[in-house]
From Swiss-Prot:
It comes from the Bacteria. It comes from Legionella pneumophila (strain Corby). This is Translational regulator CsrA. PANTHER family: CARBON STORAGE REGULATOR (PTHR34984:SF1). GO terms for biological process: mRNA catabolic process; negative regulation of translational initiation; positive regulation of translational initiation; regulation of carbohydrate metabolic process. Pfam families: CsrA. Homodimer; the beta-strands of each monomer intercalate to form a hydrophobic core, while the alpha-helices form wings that extend away from the core. Gene3D superfamilies: Translational regulator CsrA. GO terms for molecular function: mRNA 5'-UTR binding.
Length: 64
């Protein structure tokens, strides 16, 4: 895992198309701004896991 330190207003770039900017820090929360192409999905981890569970559930129902 790559670990980076950024300050408010600083940006990191992933590949050629994804920019992540630190917008603010309040206590233990960090606000991030993410610019990515429309074909790149961006989700919080808990939402992504829920989507994956729903896909697995749909796949298992179709297999029956």
């Amino acid at each position: 895992m790559l670990i980076l330190t950024r300050r408010i207003g600083e940006t990191l770039i992933i590949g050629d198309d994804v920019n992540i900017t630190v917008l603010g820090v309040k206590g233990n929360q960090v606000r991030l701004g993410i610019n990515a192409p429309k074909d790149v999905s961006v989700h919080r981890e808990e939402i992504y896991l829920r989507i994956q569970q729903e896909k697995e559930s749909d796949d298992s129902e179709q297999a029956v």
